[in-house]
Structures are given as C-alpha cells and as structure tokens.
Amino acid sequence: MEKKLSIAIDGPAAAGKSTVAKIVAEKKSYIYIDTGAMYRAITYAALQENVDLTDEEKLAELLKRTDIELITTKDGQKVFVNGTDVTEAIRTDEISNQVSIAAKHRSVREEMVKRQQQLGEKGGVVMDGRDIGTHVLPNAEVKIFLLASVEERAKRRYEENVKKGFDVNYETLIEEIARRDKLDSEREVSPLRKAEDALEIDTTSLSIQEVADKILEAVEQKSR
C-alpha cells in the first residue's frame, strides 16, 4: 500500500497555492488543509466582535473561544466559525487586507500551528500557507515553494475577484499584494521563507495544471 505523505505548499499571497493544493489533494485522495482560511476566519471573527487586530492579547483570547472548522463537501471546502458558514465572507478585500496583521502575532500563530499540526499528524494531507514547510510540518516528505511576480499575482487575484462580481482595481491589488509580501516576510514569528529542502516553482508563466503536475511528479518520486 502506498504510504500517505504530508505535502507542504508555501508561497506569498496569490501565488496559486490553494488552487494547486486542491488539485493535488483530489488527485491523491488526500485531505486539503487551507491554513490561510484559518487566519482569515479569526480575522473575520475579530472584525465581527470589534476586537482590535493589533491587540495580541485580546485576539489570542478570542481565538481560544473560536471554533474553526474546515469541512470538505462535494462543492469544495467550507469554512465554519462557531458553526456558521463563512466560506465566502472570509474572501472579501476587507479580510484580505487585514489578515497579515492578525497572523503576525506570536500567540495567535502558536495556537494555529498547534491546531494545524493536529490536523496533519497522520499524513495524507496537503497543507498550504506561509510557514508550513519551515514550521508547521517541518518533517513533511514533500515541500514546495511557489513563486510568481507581484504583477502576475495581482492579475490572478483581479480575475478571481471579477469572476465573483467584486469591484476591484488592478493597481490597488498590486499595492496590496506588495504590502502583504512585506508584512509576511518581515514578521518576527514564522516569516514567509522557503524551507531549505523545498522544491521552488516559479508559476508566473505556468498554468495551474502544469504547476500541479510538477508537484505530483515530486510526490511520485517520494512515494517510490
């Protein structure tokens, strides 16, 4: 029987991590864990309860009493906060622009990492985020680091938002993504960086399927 591996996919905002991770998980019949959605969920909960995102203590306290569930359905993964479906609500620009603030706090990340490690401990998972290969699943058999230019990532996010009917400005998206890159790579706790043993894939000129195929190839090599 083929060993069930842990697959870590890291990279900056809008590099195509979750789209690719879902394809890989489906192909391998693995569980997909979107760690970014977990940080978005606590950001959403904080905004709902008027908790200041810069107040680490209050945010950590809110997280302790917030139940975040990732549930796989036939329509894809659903995200629930305290039993309420927030799958669409956590994908707005308001959340996207503030999630890095919530994610930079040490106590918030420690609690999230604990939850993520529990989800990934048995293998057979594809987990994507910013610090999966370096911090959450440092022993993952397959580690991937996705890259793409800021312009390409802004273009993808723009097309994604237009499809959803959101009113967006391409230039604004470039600025927002560059700002998130800065926040993610400069934060003190688990900054965005490539694990030493990760396979780096520049996705700028590749289709989503081509990226997924490269990852699946790496998985096959490790499974032998």
UniProtKB/Swiss-Prot annotation:
Principal subcellular localization: cytoplasm
Disruption phenotype annotation: Essential, it cannot be disrupted.
Subcellular location: Cytoplasm
Keywords of this entry: ATP-binding, Cytoplasm, Kinase, Nucleotide-binding, Transferase
Enzyme class, broadest EC rank: transferase
Cellular component per GO, a single term: cytosol
EC number: 2.7.4.25
Pfam families: Cytidylate_kin
Gene Ontology annotations of biological process type: nucleobase-containing small molecule interconversion; pyrimidine nucleotide metabolic process
Molecular-function GO terms, alphabetical: (d)CMP kinase activity; ATP binding; CMP kinase activity; dCMP kinase activity
InterPro entries for this protein: Cytidylate_kin, Cytidylate_kinase_dom, P-loop_NTPase
Induction summary: Transcribed during sporulation. May not be transcribed with the downstream gene (a ribosomal protein bS1 homolog), there is a probable transcription terminator between the 2 genes.
Family named by the database record: Belongs to the cytidylate kinase family. Type 1 subfamily.
PANTHER family: CYTIDYLATE KINASE (PTHR21299:SF2), CYTIDYLATE KINASE/PANTOATE-BETA-ALANINE LIGASE (PTHR21299)
Name of the protein in question: Cytidylate kinase
Organism the protein comes from: Bacillus subtilis (strain 168)
Highest classification ranks of the organism: Bacteria, Bacillati, Bacillota, Bacilli, Bacillales
